[in-house]
Regions:
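Conserved beta-strand/loop subsegment of P-loop NTPase cores
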Residues: 89-92, 121-138, 170-181
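Canonical P-loop GTPase G-domain recognition
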Residues: 140-203
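Switch I (effector-binding) loop of TRAFAC-class P-loop GTPase G-domains
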Residues: 33-65, 75
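Amphipathic helical hotspot of TIR/SEFIR-family domains
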Residues: 102-130
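ATP-binding Walker
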Residues: 23
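Short, flexible boundary segments at extreme N-termini or domain junctions of P-loop NTPases and their
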Residues: 1-17
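Inter-motif core of Ras-like GTPase G domains
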Residues: 77-103, 116-120
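Walker A/P-loop
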Residues: 26
Length: 203
């Protein structure tokens, strides 16, 4: 991965992290402020012993703002709208494991969220980059069983879920919406997730 390209794409950018309570916003924000990612990420059973080159995320000088949880009351989306309007990049986090399990309550919540976000994106003069980030995949048995070289198939199956197809459509379609899946259960899992996100930022 080319760190120089990431620096050009993201340095000093304003980043909004949106999502309901319990999706991992605080964890991701903290990692983006203090963590680091390897120059090259290989999924391994055991941590790599070799001291490979690492990139310190604070070097990006990201201006990260995280949303508070909002209730179902539409008036509570005002804070999200403010964050959206000030952002160059938006990360919308959701519980991928619950959508895979067909949790209707979570489906209803993310549908409401994307109705709002999608409307803001459509009317935005300078459209921010938009990412749907599915977290808690470690709680899905199929994710745990999926070998690294078949991970693309896992993502494709997730994107094919009717609710995800709807969310992507509301966000502006497949050309405008990046979908990234992973886990933040461990430090290494979080590194892998952020690595995937950054790869899509510069692709």
């Amino acid at each position: 991965m080319k760190w120089d390209a990431i620096m050009v794409a993201l340095r000093g950018k304003r980043l909004a992290v949106l999502g309901a309570r319990g999706v991992g916003k605080t964890h991701l924000v903290k990692f983006l402020a203090t963590g680091s990612i390897p120059a090259e990420y290989k999924q391994t059973v055991a941590p790599e012993k070799s001291a490979s080159r690492r990139f310190q995320l604070h070097d990006l000088d990201l201006k990260v703002k995280s949303s508070l949880d909002v209730s179902g009351d539409k008036a509570a989306y005002g804070e999200w709208k403010q964050l959206h309007d000030q952002a160059d990049v938006i990360f919308y986090l959701l519980r991928a494991d619950r959508l895979i399990a067909g949790d209707h309550k979570v489906e209803s919540r993310v549908r409401d969220d994307l109705k709002h976000i999608g409307g803001w994106l459509q009317t935005s003069v300078s459209r921010p980059r938009f990412f749907i980030i599915g977290t808690h995949c470690d709680l899905d048995a199929n994710f745990v069983r999926t070998p690294a070289d078949n991970f693309g198939d896992y993502v494709d199956r997730f994107r094919a879920l009717p609710i995800v197809t709807e969310l992507v459509s509301r966000g502006g379609g497949a050309q405008q919406v990046n979908v990234v899946l992973g886990s933040m259960k461990s430090h290494q899992d979080t590194e892998a997730l952020v690595y995937q996100i950054f790869r899509q930022v510069v692709s």
